[in-house]
């Protein structure tokens, strides 16, 4: 990718937090167990994704977490606090509309931090238009709909194992390839 290319990082904060809490930890994450979002941007910068515009989608239907919003702004994320009075999944709808707008434009690649299969049609459309599309999350919890897009060129990056976005090792069990197996981690 060239420096002129723009890559949009879209973070589905609700999905990442819910997956971390319910599927990985089995409880609400403590603040020191949450991703270090600055490391995500550092990883992207070090891996030639061109110019990055980072959007962090938040459900602000009940309230807006101002301390977190201020932290996001300090890390060069643009918070997108969405609200609705209906039963809509506000963050999902906001991200879907954003993906559709990017697909309708002449350029723009996407990195999506989410496990949610609801974004499959929009990501497929981007891939079919030749855009670079990457999903960040916990690989073992990625929806089948998104996983199937790897046949179309979707790249998957693990939030913990590849980006190293956490200060603590998470209690995850996953398949270990022999070339990465380190017996000392089990002794």
PLM feature spans:
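Domain-level signal for Mg2+-assisted phosphodiester chemistry and nucleotide/NA-binding surfaces
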Residues: 1-89, 128, 132
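Nuclease catalytic cores that cleave nucleic-acid phosphodiester bonds
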Residues: 62-187
């Amino acid at each position: 990718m060239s420096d002129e290319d723009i890559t949009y990082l879209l973070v589905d904060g609700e999905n990442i937090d819910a997956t971390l809490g319910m599927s990985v930890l089995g409880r609400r994450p403590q603040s020191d167990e949450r991703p270090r979002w600055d490391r995500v941007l550092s990883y992207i910068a070090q891996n030639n994704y061109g110019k990055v515009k980072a959007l962090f989608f938040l459900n602000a239907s009940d309230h807006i977490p101002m301390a977190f919003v201020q932290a996001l702004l300090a890390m060069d994320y643009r918070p997108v606090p969405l609200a609705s009075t209906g039963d809509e999944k506000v963050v999902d709808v906001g991200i879907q509309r954003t993906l559709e707008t990017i697909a309708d434009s002449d350029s723009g690649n996407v990195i999506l931090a989410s496990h949610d299969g609801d974004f499959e049609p929009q990501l497929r459309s981007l891939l079919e238009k030749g855009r670079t599309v990457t999903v960040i999350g916990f690989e073992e919890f990625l929806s089948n709909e998104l996983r199937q897009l790897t046949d179309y060129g979707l790249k998957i990056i693990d939030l913990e194992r590849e980006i190293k976005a956490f200060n603590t090792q998470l209690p995850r069990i996953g398949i270990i390839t022999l070339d990465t197996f380190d017996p000392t981690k089990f002794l």
